[in-house]
Amino acid sequence: MPSAIIVEDEVLAAERLRVLLEECNVVLLNVFHHAMPALEWLSVHEVDIVFADIGMPEIDGLEFVERIKRTAKRQPEIVFTTAYEEHALRAFELAAADYL
């Protein structure tokens, strides 16, 4: 089964995604509500998929992915959670696997 983390500043959205992933038999390793703790975690842990919100307060999801590329122990697949198509297009430029 694939492993994943969620990086989503909105608690309710993170919870909804958590339930969906568990129903799909995805092993959820962690949920983060801020990008910086997630980056620190990724520097020492491996995960298959990162579900990341684009509109986060500290650093946006696009910058978050740029930092993952520089610091992650292993490069995970990235799936962005966004309601805006223009964000999705930019995400694909950064090699996102998909968006929700």
What residues fall within each predicted segment?
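Non-catalytic signal-transmission and effector/linker regions of two-component phosphorelay proteins
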Residues: 1-3
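Conserved beta-strand positions in the Rossmann-like core of class I SAM-dependent methyltransferases
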Residues: 5, 29-30
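Conserved acidic carboxylate
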Residues: 8
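Charged phosphotransfer/docking patches of two-component systems
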Residues: 11-15, 88
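Acidic, metal-coordinating helix/loop segments flanking the phosphotransfer/catalytic sites
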Residues: 18, 22, 31-49
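A generic structural motif
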Residues: 24-29, 74-76
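CheY-like receiver
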Residues: 39-41, 45-100
